[in-house]
Amino acid sequence: MERRAGSRLRAWMLLLLLCPVQGRQKDSGSKWKVFLDQINRALENYEPCSSQNCSCYHGVIEEDLTPFRGGISRKMMAEVVRRKLGTHYQIIKNRLFREDDCMFPSRCSGVEHFILEVIHRLPDMEMVINVRDYPQVPKWMEPTIPVFSFSKTSEYHDIMYPAWTFWEGGPAVWPLYPTGLGRWDLFREDLLRSAAQWPWEKKNSTAYFRGSRTSPERDPLILLSRKNPKLVDAEYTKNQAWKSMKDTLGKPAAKDVHLIDHCKYRYLFNFRGVAASFRFKHLFLCGSLVFHVGDEWVEFFYPQLKPWVHYIPVKTDLSNVQELLQFVKANDDIAQEIAKRGSQFIINHLQMDDITCYWENLLTDYSKFLSYNVTRRKDYYQIVPRRLKTEL
């Protein structure tokens, strides 16, 4: 009974957040008409997804597996393994086996955690899982071959899976995250506690970004911050590739800032790095308004996050960033509602159960396209569950 009442309350709150925004700001006027119209269209076209059986993301699985509807042959799989495009795994009689070679052991471990969570319900299969940053199957490649990657653009046929960072193996940032980002379930709790300490009205209204220069697409925001520090507080930090101040646009590197301390700010920026950015999902849980720059790189959950509904979309060259910041400052209640919708989506649809469920649905559907019986490779060793980690 309580669960039904809770579901009705959440549905009512969602309907309230999805109400059209036109005419609700006294001074919006024609100055902001373009943005207000985009928000209204986005809300009118938005269809909230179900929380049942992680069906929210089923369309992503379906689209990623479409190229393989003709079947995956033993010969095709042998070619993928031969080309070393990732780590080769086999699931046989509800046991997980792997070749010895893995470029990033902690990343493989993060992947294996989720497979082992559902392995007792999985049929026999084999697959190649890429734990590099970059996808491996460009669309011009013929024939299309099955490789699992955590992120891609529309130019690739890789099959997306939930990244290892939901458990472990994320980027190490010393001294904040010396063993890397991980344990999404624990991190969620930390971020939500910080968000409660920094409600919207207490947040600093200066836009905020801290990160390393993994992509020059971030440069315009750093330069804007130097020109107008009251509008934007954005600085480069060091990463493993840092050699001199040239790598931080001629200024000393800033100190790294814990993600929970980002919650002090009302407007947070997300950029792609080498591929999709791991910080994206974290920013929403601050209850802040996320400015998402560019839309080329995606992870499996991105397609259900909609521009103007859950975040503010920013052009890749940042040519519209100042106008967007002026808009949200002039329309604070609208900005807050977008932030709430973004936060609620991640809270409701990106729980650890959703990650595990996605892995199970993805591998189960994928296995149906294998046109042969998998034979265990004798030199592969069995992966067994490790002791549960209870700290980040």
UniProtKB/Swiss-Prot annotation:
Its EC number is 2.4.1.376, 2.4.2.63. Keywords: Developmental protein, Disulfide bond, Endoplasmic reticulum, Gastrulation, Glycoprotein, Glycosyltransferase, Signal, Transferase. Widely expressed in newborn and adult tissues (at protein level). Residues 1-23 form the signal peptide. SMART domains: CAP10. It catalyses: L-seryl-[EGF-like domain protein] + UDP-alpha-D-xylose = 3-O-(beta-D-xylosyl)-L-seryl-[EGF-like domain protein] + UDP + H(+); L-seryl-[EGF-like domain protein] + UDP-alpha-D-glucose = 3-O-(beta-D-glucosyl)-L-seryl-[EGF-like domain protein] + UDP + H(+). It is an enzyme of class 2 (transferase). UDP-alpha-D-glucose binds at residues 177, 212, 218, 274-279. Disulfide bonds join 49-56, 54-357, 102-108, 263-286. It is found in: Endoplasmic reticulum lumen. InterPro entries: CAP10 (IPR006598), O-Glucosyltr/Glycosyltrsf_90 (IPR051091). GO terms for biological process: axial mesoderm development; circulatory system development; gastrulation; muscle tissue development; paraxial mesoderm development; positive regulation of Notch signaling pathway; protein O-linked glycosylation; protein O-linked glycosylation via serine. One of its GO terms (molecular function) is EGF-domain serine glucosyltransferase activity. Glycans are attached at residues 53, 204, 373. Pathway: Protein modification; protein glycosylation. A motif (Prevents secretion from ER) lies at residues 389-392. One of its GO terms (cellular component) is endoplasmic reticulum lumen. Residues 103-107, 172-178 are annotated as: Interaction with the consensus sequence C-X-S-X-[PA]-C in peptide substrates. It comes from the Eukaryota. Pfam families: Glyco_transf_90. Disruption phenotype: Mutant embryos die at or before 9.5 dpc. At 7.0 to 7.5 dpc, they cannot be morphologically distinguished from wild-type littermates. At 8.0 dpc, mutant embryos exhibit an abnormally expanded neural plate that does not fold properly, absence of heart rudiments and posterior axis truncation. Defects are caused by a deficit of mesoderm caused by impaired gastrulation. The active site is at residue 133. Belongs to the glycosyltransferase 90 family. Dual specificity glycosyltransferase that catalyzes the transfer of glucose and xylose from UDP-glucose and UDP-xylose, respectively, to a serine residue found in the consensus sequence of C-X-S-X-P-C. Specifically targets extracellular EGF repeats of protein such as CRB2, F7, F9 and NOTCH2. Acts as a positive regulator of Notch signaling by mediating O-glucosylation of Notch, leading to regulate muscle development. Notch glucosylation does not affect Notch ligand binding. This is Protein O-glucosyltransferase 1.
